[in-house]
């Protein structure tokens, strides 16, 4: 909530003082509004990709001549290059075969730190509940990791990456993280490229907690420097990246035109203009071509909830917001006449958007699932209103009361539900499961909430906001800002463990459904890096990623 400022406005017969928003303008202008697909280049890429895809399939299949370490390395490379979605079943079958052939990891090859670490991480990421006690073989009699490992940089790097898939009570992985981090930080300045770049990058952003598409773009450039690279896989990855980027640019152009036609920048100047950042967010949830419709729908929803959020946070007064909240609960265009003129604009746009969703999904007989997204929208608006009243009344709730309300205003209940709308594979049972707030969803929402609270604390404090999570915790427990932030960081770590646990088999829904939740968690780790709010202030955090993924293509 922004502080009150002298912006006079009439409401009935009385003059009111509104807040002033201080959001920076869009970084992008009209850059993405139009995109003309070069069909000749796209066709050429697609043709080459089909040939390379078949060659890559053969490379994956020709495993009998490779050692276990080479097979695992190959799968890891294919996944990091962003082309694994072409070979999902083949990769799943390979990993299943490795696991069933040696479920206790007794082969001598597993005495190699890199091999065991890669296998452990890959199996965990694919849902296998593998015990981390396997790493005991690398510890001494005192239960500490052997100092002799400190010279095995690739082994340490993969141990570090493996430690990020940890769940609750896995102390050995906590020790693995501390041990590998310390030795990698010490070694990094003395390494040669590309290994030095990989170590520095990993310490900045772990693979498991990063946005897959961001990691793909980075890894393609790193893999090109490798002496032992596979040229077929590299060329396939480059072409696939560029072809998929063309689709992403088309989608962003559609979202940008929709946003421009709404003209909120002119009619609702108090709100954030972040359509491009909204689309980037969706690429983190799913980048693959089959999710094109889903990305566009999710991007529009994020942009719309941003407008609603800013209406509560940066412009509206309580009596207006009360009517606005009630109108959204009723979800009927006839309610529009009750609203102030500026609210009519966003109210109509909101209802129109969901009507569009229903029409679009009716083509596949799925219009009924829009109901679940509407209910999440109503929920978040109710909770926004509670926060607005707290601010106006100067009320600081107990931290438990704060969190029970603020989990919804993190937007992640809404965004997770919306992420399934455009997924043809998401059925009513999946939406019902999600509506019951399963543990993995609760963890994801908590993660978003507490990391956002840490990142935005200083800014909100400067605006006069007292009902922040950090302030509430400090007041309740009589601790310093630093201690409160440490506690929230602990809550985030606990939430990550719940997310990691939630993707392990057996699962109540498909891996495809669960991956959206995992990816939403990953977006938080990237967007709020170093406690910065990358969405509100995208200049430092998101701008380089957006340029890498949506502006610059890869040189072929």
From Swiss-Prot:
Residues binding Mg(2+) 1, per UniProt: 309, 313
GO cellular component: cytoplasm
Pfam families linked to this entry: Terpene_synth, Terpene_synth_C
Residue numbers covered by motif DDXXD motif: 309-313
GO BP annotations listed: diterpenoid biosynthetic process
Principal localisation: cytoplasm
Catalytic activity annotation: (2E,6E)-farnesyl diphosphate = (-)-vetispiradiene + diphosphate
Binding site for Mg(2+) 3: 452, 456, 460
Keywords: Cytoplasm, Lyase, Magnesium, Metal-binding
Cofactor comment text: Binds 3 Mg(2+) ions per subunit.
Function (record text): Sesquiterpene synthase that catalyzes the formation of vetispiradiene from trans,trans-farnesyl diphosphate. The initial internal cyclization produces the monocyclic intermediate germacrene A.
Protein name (Swiss-Prot/TrEMBL): Vetispiradiene synthase 1
Species the sequence originates in: Solanum tuberosum
């Amino acid at each position: 909530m922004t502080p009150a400022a002298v912006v006079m406005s009439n409401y009935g017969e009385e003059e009111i003082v509104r807040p002033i928003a201080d959001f920076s303008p869009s970084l992008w202008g009209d850059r993405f509004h139009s995109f003309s697909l070069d069909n000749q280049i796209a066709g050429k890429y697609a043709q080459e990709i089909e040939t390379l895809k078949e060659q890559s399939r053969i490379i994956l299949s020709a495993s009998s001549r490779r050692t276990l370490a080479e097979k695992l390395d190959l799968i890891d490379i294919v996944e990091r290059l962003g082309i694994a979605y072409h070979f999902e079943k083949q990769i799943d079958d390979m990993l299943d075969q490795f696991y069933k052939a040696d479920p206790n990891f007794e082969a001598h090859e597993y005495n190699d730190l890199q091999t065991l670490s890669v296998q452990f991480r890959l199996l965990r990421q694919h849902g296998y509940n593998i015990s981390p006690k396997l790493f005991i073989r690398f510890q001494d009699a005192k239960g500490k990791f052997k100092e002799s490992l400190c010279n095995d940089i690739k082994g340490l790097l993969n141990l570090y990456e493996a430690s990020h898939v940890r769940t609750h009570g896995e102390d050995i992985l906590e020790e693995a993280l501390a041990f590998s981090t310390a030795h990698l930080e010490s070694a990094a300045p003395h390494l040669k490229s590309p290994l030095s770049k990989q170590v520095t990058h990993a310490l900045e952003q772990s693979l498991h907690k990063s946005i897959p598409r961001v990691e793909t773009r980075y890894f393609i450039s790193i893999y090109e420097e490798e002496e032992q690279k596979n040229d077929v896989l590299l060329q396939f990855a480059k072409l696939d990246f560029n072809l998929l980027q063309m689709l992403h640019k088309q989608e962003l152009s559609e979202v940008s035109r929709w946003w421009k036609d709404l003209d909120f920048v002119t009619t609702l100047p108090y709100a954030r203009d972040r359509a491009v950042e909204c689309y980037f967010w969706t690429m983190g949830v799913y980048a693959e071509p089959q999710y094109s419709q889903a990305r566009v729908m999710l991007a529009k929803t994020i942009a719309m909830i941003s407008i609603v959020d800013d209406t509560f946070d940066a412009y509206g007064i309580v009596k207006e917001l009360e009517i606005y909240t009630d109108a959204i609960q009723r979800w009927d265009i006839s309610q529009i006449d009750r609203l102030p003129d500026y609210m009519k604009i966003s109210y109509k746009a909101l209802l129109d958007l969901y009507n569009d969703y229903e029409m679009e999904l009716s083509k596949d007989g799925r219009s009924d699932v829009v109901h679940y997204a509407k209910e999440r929208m109503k929920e978040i608006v109710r909770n926004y209103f509670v926060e607005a009243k707290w601010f106006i009344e100067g009320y600081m709730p107990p931290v438990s009361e704060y969190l029970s309300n603020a989990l919804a205003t993190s937007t992640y209940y809404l965004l997770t539900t919306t992420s399934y709308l455009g997924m043809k594979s998401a059925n009513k049972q999946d939406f019902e499961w999600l509506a019951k707030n399963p543990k993995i969803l609760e963890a994801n929402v908590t993660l978003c909430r507490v990391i956002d609270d840490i990142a935005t604390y200083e800014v909100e404090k400067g605006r006069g906001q007292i009902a922040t999570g950090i302030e509430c915790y400090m007041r309740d427990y009589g601790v310093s800002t630093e201690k409160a932030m440490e506690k929230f960081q602990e809550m985030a770590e606990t939430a990550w463990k719940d997310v990691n646990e939630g993707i392990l088999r057996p699962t109540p829904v498909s891996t495809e459904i669960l991956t959206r939740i995992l990816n939403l968690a990953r977006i938080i780790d990237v967007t709020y890096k170093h406690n910065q709010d990358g969405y509100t202030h995208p200049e430092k955090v998101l701008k380089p990623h957006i340029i890498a993924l949506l502006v610059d293509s890869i040189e072929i």
